[in-house]
Amino acid sequence: MPKGPVVIKVSGKYVNPEKPGLVKRYAQVLHELHSVGYRLVVVVGGGPEARRYIEAARELGLGKSFQDILGIEASRLNARLLIYALHPNAYPEPPRSIWELLEAYSTGLIVVAGGFQPGQSTSGVAALVAEAIGAELLVLATTVDGVYTADPAVDKSAQLIPRLSYEEFRRVVRQSMSPGRYELLDPVAISIVERSNIPVRVVNGSDPENVKRVVLGEELGSLITG
C-alpha cells in the first residue's frame, strides 16, 4: 500500500559531483523508503556548482534571469546524478515544470527534480510540488540541525527551536537568515506550505539517515506546522 507522499528538498551541497559517496548514501536511503511503499519526490539544489556559474555570469555582466538559468541547469545536473544513482527506481529525466513532474509522478517511480524557472528557488519548487501532489510531509535536508533563533554559523548562542508555527518560521527567516548560508524556505515557499497546511521538517542533511528517520516518523530537528 502506498505511503506518503513525501517531498524531500536536499541541499546541493550534499548532492553534487564532488560527493559521490554521499550521493550513493542518499540513493540507498531513498531506495529503502521506496521499497516499503513511500511515494517520493526529491528536489535538489544547485550547490557550489550553481554558485560558481552565477558568479561567472555576474562577472560577465549578465542579468539576474541568466544567472538563474545557469543555477537551474546546475541543479538539474545534480538531480540527474541522483537519478542515475537510483536507477532503475527513478524516473529517467528531471522534470522541467510542475506538469512534467506530475506526469513523472504518476509512474510510481521516485522523481528527482532541480529548478524549474528563473525567479523561483529550488525550495519554492519543493513547496509547489508538495502542494501539487498533496504531500503529507516536506523534509528540508539542510546544512543545519533545524530552525534556530539566529544563523548558527555566525551566532554561537543561537538556539534550536523544536516546534514552531508558519508565522514564527516566517519571522525567523525574515530576521535571521544569512543569504546563501542558512538554507530554509523563502517567503513564497512558506506561503505555499501554509495555505495547504503542509508540515515541514527541517533536519541536517549531511547524514541521509536523518531524512529516513523523519520520514518514518521520528522526532528530529524542527517541525513547522499550522
Curated annotation (Swiss-Prot):
GO MF annotation list: ATP binding; UMP kinase activity
Domain of life: Archaea
Pathway annotation from the record: Pyrimidine metabolism; CTP biosynthesis via de novo pathway; UDP from UMP (UMPK route): step 1/1
EC top class, as a word: transferase
Regulation: Inhibited by UTP.
GO cellular component: cytoplasm
Annotated positions binding ATP: 9-13, 47, 51, 142, 148, 151
Keyword annotations of the record: ATP-binding, Cytoplasm, Kinase, Nucleotide-binding, Pyrimidine biosynthesis, Transferase
Role summary: Catalyzes the reversible phosphorylation of UMP to UDP.
Subunit structure: Homohexamer.
Family: Belongs to the UMP kinase family.
Name of this protein: Uridylate kinase
Protein's gene: pyrH
